[in-house]
Design a protein with these regions (language model features):
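The catalytic Nudix box helix
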Residues: 56-57, 72-106
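A glycine-rich, hydrophobic loop/mini-helix early in the fold
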Residues: 43-75
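A structural signal for short, well-ordered beta-strand segments
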Residues: 46, 75, 105, 126-128
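Histidine-centered active-site/metal-ligand motif
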Residues: 35, 41, 78, 122, ...
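Nudix hydrolase/Nudix homology domain
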Residues: 30-32, 69, 110-112, 119-187
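Detector for glycine-centered tight turns/loop "hinges" at secondary-structure junctions
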Residues: 21-24, 53, 69, 118
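Acidic, metal-coordinating catalytic segment for phosphate/diphosphate chemistry
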Residues: 4-45, 49-51
Length: 187
């Protein structure tokens, strides 16, 4: 993943951090192999809200190896070895959405989802939130499109059209939304 100088080498296969259910690192594995073997690994999901309480969604690039063309939360990926959740979130927000947004960690959960192509996501997912009124400058290799969506309308659309969204987003959204509603009550 990195050369002797510690610089990331994009030609080297991306590795994921394998973890136990307490999020303790137990090793690393190539990303594709981890998804083929359904190994539990560390991941993160970023949700960005604007001042109108709309969520920034991305449509995954059509070339993605799973869940291509589906709508999902603002950004999601995997931490690198030694990288904090916020560092990983900031890195991928810049790579995918072309923006910098301060992130706050909200909660973690474990999920497992098998896809039609035989790959399985088995992740301990760290969910983070950020706030901005800026539109992203999307990287077309990662993201096909974006939109801001009002939370209640999104909740309704997730119920009516779940096949338009990634599996993990349908799993996370209600918990995220409840967390934000509680946070807004105490603010």
């Amino acid at each position: 993943m990195s050369n002797l100088l510690g610089i990331f080498d994009p030609m080297e296969e991306e590795k994921v951090v394998l973890v136990d259910i307490q999020d303790q690192q137990i090793g690393t594995m190539g990303k594709m192999e981890a998804h083929e073997k359904a190994e539990l690994h560390r991941a993160f999901s970023v949700f960005v809200l604007n001042s109108k309480n709309e969520l920034l969604l991305q449509q995954r690039a059509h070339e993605k190896y799973h869940s291509s063309g589906l709508w999902t939360n603002t950004c999601c990926s995997h931490q690198r070895v030694g990288e904090t959740n916020r560092e990983a979130g900031a890195r991928r927000m810049m790579e995918e959405m072309g923006m910098t947004v301060p992130l706050e960690e909200l909660f973690t959960f474990i999920y497992r989802a098998t896809f039609d192509n035989g790959l399985t996501e088995h992740e301990l997912d760290h969910v983070m939130v950020g706030y901005t009124d800026d539109d992203p400058v999307i990287n077309p290799e990662e993201v096909a499109d974006f939109k801001w969506m009002e939370m209640e309308a999104l909740q309704k659309d997730l119920t009516e059209n779940p096949d338009h969204y990634t599996v993990w987003f349908t799993i996370i959204f209600d918990r995220f939304y409840k967390h934000i509603q509680e946070k807004n009550k105490t603010a």
